[in-house]
Amino acid sequence: MSSRARHSIAAVLTLALALAGCSGGSGSPAGDETRAPAVRGEAAPTAGSPFWVDPQSDAARQVEQWQSQGRTEDAKVLKRISERPVADWPAGDDPVPDIRRAVKGAAGKRTVVLVAYNIPHRDCGLYSAGGARDGQAYLDWINSFADAIGDARALVILEPDAVSHLVDGCTPAEYQGERNQLLSEAVDRLKRQPGTKVYLDAGNPAWIKEPSKIAEPLRTAGVARADGFSLNVSNFQTDEAVKAFGTQLSGLLDGAHFTVDTSRNGEGPLSGEGDESWCNPPGRSLGTPPTAETGDALVDAFLWIKRPGDSDGPCRGGPSAGTWWPDYALGLARRAGA
């Protein structure tokens, strides 16, 4: 799973010269932005949520394990994650089993939240490098992804990083035209499913700082035919900072709506830690719980897209990107209840 907060421009240039890829900026919160409301107390009941909660998630299995080991207090705290809906990131080789399991679990009563993350040349060769081997393989994957959703209610976050890496120059010029075409075709294919909403990822306000720089690339990638764009995926920017950025960007995109990843932004971003402040930063906490009741006409949902407790990569003692890290998860949950 990709980490969406990224290096400074200077670091990007250095990496580019070394042909080692590049990434978006993590940045520090500007001024005295209001901190996103954190989760307090026990996990909220799931009955009022429109989104599916996976009873077999890593967090849920960890709760069971700790309960069996007598770590009852830690298990209770971790329920702040396990009892809330988080996104599913279907496998890059075959997305069908993951999606079908989620759709079956939702049983037509909940919306499954999915992340399509398999674009060729993904993450510019960094911690979450990979993706489909070529354009046709990607289109085949997207077709299987969409077929597996069927008529179910689904919300799809389409290709975190992909457009932002076009804007920051990370994606080499020879791949840019293909990427735009693939994203556009992916939007159209997913929107053929009657119950599917699609949000094309647009990075975060500490990465692409000026909304005007990403508006036209989003248009080229097909955002007008999607349901909107997504912000803050796997990042830590506050709700207020993200909503302000999203509102400006929406104004450049004919009033497009957007979603916000609030999975780990309860304390905002880590400042003063250089280029990898985005990678497994200490002292963070869960943010606003997933909901479609956002209180903002432009914000369709607050979502936990980055699965709280999954590592950003092998930094600060973490495992590889996307790997469950129970100690980090426990810290996020515990600080949310402080």
Regions found by a protein language model. Name each.
Residues 1-28:
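Secretory targeting and sorting signals
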Residues 46-148, 152, 307-336:
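N-terminal carbohydrate-binding/catalytic regions of secreted carbohydrate-active enzymes
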Residues 54-82, 205-329:
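Surface-exposed substrate-engagement region within the catalytic domains
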Residues 88-93, 102, 126-135, 168-177, ...:
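Second-shell loop/turn segments in exported
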